[in-house]
Amino acid sequence: FMELIQHYNARLRPNESGVREAALQKNLYVDNCIVGADDYGSVMPHVLSNFVNIVTLNYQIGVLYVQNPPRRVLESLQSALDGDIEYKGSSYVKLTRTVLKTIYQNLDNDVLGQDQCKKQILSGMYRLTTGTHGKPVVLMLYGPSGVGKTESAKSISKSLGGELLRIQFSMMQTEEAFNYVFGAEHSKSSLARDMVGRESNVILIDEFDKVNPAFYNAFYELFDEGRYVDTNYDIDLGQAV
């Protein structure tokens, strides 16, 4: 994809590219074009808004793979190519009673003591086993340092087959942190981008009580309905923990 963008930019500014204009006007044939999740941050905003026009202008692509597209890219694709789009998403481990037993066994091995807390964690997660619950399970682990809060989250994530996504909220005290949570420029790191690329369906928001209360507004819809929306992404977290 980035090679295609370089060719596109050279076509816009042939005098600066050093490439003969006749060569730039030739159609390019590509069997497979892959747009990785990190590629969006390497291009200008107009590339996202005109994504379909750019990738189809004088380019013939057999199969276009687009990973975790921002909203503008997805809407551009849906508007022009909706009937030709095949959607594939990550599949996370489905929570069943058997999986709950595994979670409890791992918690027992990984975290010393806290027997009542472990039972309450399992009780909170049980509703996801019905398969009809469209909201995430929100668990508040509260207590002094060293009692096993973070280790419990890591253990649950391990049981569900992936590395824990850990968001360190004690660092969220600047304007850059505000942009990270609510989304700003597509080229910047964001909470939404991190969540859409997570390995497991377990997200730890560490030291949630240490942040400016203004940040809590970003989580009301997530906790209530399982959706997280910022300026670039709209994410379904309905079965997350």
Go through the PLM ranges and name each one.
Residues F1-A23:
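Extended, compositionally biased accessory segments flanking or bridging domains
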Residues F1-M2, H133-I167:
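Walker A/P-loop
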Residues S159-S187:
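AAA+/P-loop NTPase substrate/partner-engagement loops
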